[in-house]
């Protein structure tokens, strides 16, 4: 039995979707449970060359043997959820989905408030998905819960009970975090943050798992960090620099161009300490050095690629166990058992 949490180490968009999908295939968890804020964070999953952009369904959905869960701490937009279940019909997502009956519900009024609030939309760079206003209502105890919405009633259940029973029975469980540690309401660059905490301890609480049940925390870092929206970015490079390196990205949810920077070892060290990270996953190493593209054995990485990994381990103090060298799941180096 192993309970693993995957957390973003930067400002989101680190490639958690790829790492989560890989772990779900390799480790075959019984339940894949989603923590985090809500549908404000998007993940892109590539399966057999086809890309899926999702915001509610756990990104481990390609593992058709696992139950998929959305924890009580996660805000749920029924409209988004039902569209994704339909889109992923060939993966039998609807038959495997458990939405906690206590989850908070985003309604149209929350999205309207989010988009019309000038402070949130222009100064902070909110995604406009209604999460902030919904969390306000939750704090005021006026927010609807999953059990109050008929359209999702067939998917409702007790996620905490399901996850804990799976762990007690000796099964693997994977908890998906969303966004990144540096967007945490508590520990990020306030006020340019999201509407709740985005660290491992909170993700465990979101799905109803106690801290002593967590075995592994995988912090995911991209070889070059990116950020959507406003806020400090200590190692940010110019648009011209990013384009010269061939690094041009757009957000999954907002479609806004991502700001790009250089890897920040000091911030990475703080993030790993904050999350109690036991492992690091590095994504997009092939963007740092295209000679690393598609490599699946550590020994075959370029010297430049190896030097990057070594520097991360030495300066951050946590072992790099997973390295992504391309978008496909097979383009992954896994040294966890070496």
From Swiss-Prot:
For this protein, the record's InterPro entries field holds: Adenylosuccin_syn_GTP-bd (IPR018220), Adenylosuccinate_synth_dom1 (IPR042109), Adenylosuccinate_synth_dom2 (IPR042110), Adenylosuccinate_synth_dom3 (IPR042111), Adenylosuccinate_synthetase (IPR001114), P-loop_NTPase (IPR027417)
Q: Where in the cell is it found?
A: Cytoplasm
List all membrane-crossing ranges.
none
Alphabetic keyword roster: Cytoplasm, GTP-binding, Ligase, Magnesium, Metal-binding, Nucleotide-binding, Purine biosynthesis
Pathway listed for it is: Purine metabolism; AMP biosynthesis via de novo pathway; AMP from IMP: step 1/2
In this chain, substrate is annotated as bound at 252-258
**Cofactor info, note text:** Binds 1 Mg(2+) ion per subunit.
Q: Does the keyword Cell division apply?
A: no
Q: Does the keyword Ligase apply?
A: yes
Q: Name one GO cellular component term.
A: cytoplasm
Record-listed Mg(2+) binding positions: 13, 42
Chain sites annotated for binding IMP: 13-16, 40-43, 127, 141, 179, 194, 256
Q: What is its main location?
A: cytoplasm
Q: Which residues of this UniProt protein bind GTP?
A: 12-18, 42-44, 258, 284-286, 324-326
GO terms classed as biological process: 'de novo' AMP biosynthetic process; IMP metabolic process
The protein's GO terms of the molecular function aspect are: adenylosuccinate synthase activity; GTP binding; magnesium ion binding
Under the heading SMART domains, the entry gives:
Adenylsucc_synt (SM00788)
According to its UniProt record, the EC number is 6.3.4.4
- Reading the lineage from the top rank, the first entry is Archaea
- UniProt cofactor(s): Mg(2+)
What reaction is this protein's catalytic activity? IMP + L-aspartate + GTP = N(6)-(1,2-dicarboxyethyl)-AMP + GDP + phosphate + 2 H(+)
Protein family: Belongs to the adenylosuccinate synthetase family.
- What binding partners and quaternary form does the record give? Homodimer.
Function per UniProt? Plays an important role in the de novo pathway of purine nucleotide biosynthesis. Catalyzes the first committed step in the biosynthesis of AMP from IMP.
| Protein name per its UniProtKB record | Adenylosuccinate synthetase
Give the originating organism. Methanococcus maripaludis (strain C7 / ATCC BAA-1331)
Lineage, highest ranks first: Archaea, Methanobacteriati, Methanobacteriota, Methanomada group, Methanococci
What gene, per UniProt, encodes this protein? purA
């Amino acid at each position: 039995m192993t309970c693993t949490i995957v957390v973003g180490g930067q400002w989101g968009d680190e490639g958690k979707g790829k790492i989560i999908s890989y772990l779900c295939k390799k480790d075959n968890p019984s339940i894949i449970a989603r923590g985090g804020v809500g549908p404000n964070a998007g993940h892109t999953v590539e399966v057999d060359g086809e890309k899926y952009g999702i915001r509610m369904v756990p990104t481990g959905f390609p593992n058709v043997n696992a139950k998929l869960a959305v924890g009580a701490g996660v805000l749920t937009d029924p409209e988004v959820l039902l569209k994704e279940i339909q889109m992923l019909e060939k993966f039998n997502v609807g038959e495997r989905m458990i939405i906690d009956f206590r989850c908070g519900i985003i309604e149209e009024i929350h999205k309207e408030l989010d988009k019309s609030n000038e402070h949130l939309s222009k100064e902070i760079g909110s995604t406009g998905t209604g999460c902030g206003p919904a969390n306000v209502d939750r704090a005021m105890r006026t927010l609807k819960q999953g059990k109050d919405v008929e359209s999702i009633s067939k998917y409702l259940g007790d996620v905490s009970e399901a996850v804990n029973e799976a762990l007690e029975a000796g099964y693997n469980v994977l908890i998906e975090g969303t966004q990144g540690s540096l967007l945490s309401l508590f520990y990020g660059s306030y006020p340019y943050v999201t509407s709740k905490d985005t660290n491992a301890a909170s993700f465990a609480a979101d799905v109803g798992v106690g801290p002593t049940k967590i075995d592994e925390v995988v912090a995911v870092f991209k070889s070059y960090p990116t950020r959507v929206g406003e806020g400090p970015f200590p190692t940010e490079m110019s648009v011209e620099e990013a384009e010269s390196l061939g690094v041009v990205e757009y957000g999954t949810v907002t479609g806004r161009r991502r700001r790009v920077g250089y890897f920040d070892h000091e911030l990475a060290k703080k993030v790993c300490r904050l999350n109690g990270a036991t492992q690091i996953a590095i994504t997009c190493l092939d963007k740092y050095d295209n000679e690393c593209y598609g490599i699946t054995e550590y020994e075959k990485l370029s010297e430049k690629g190896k030097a990057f990994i070594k520097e991360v381990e030495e300066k951050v103090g946590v072992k790099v166990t997973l390295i992504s060298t391309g978008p496909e799941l097979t383009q992954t180096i896994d040294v966890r058992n070496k």
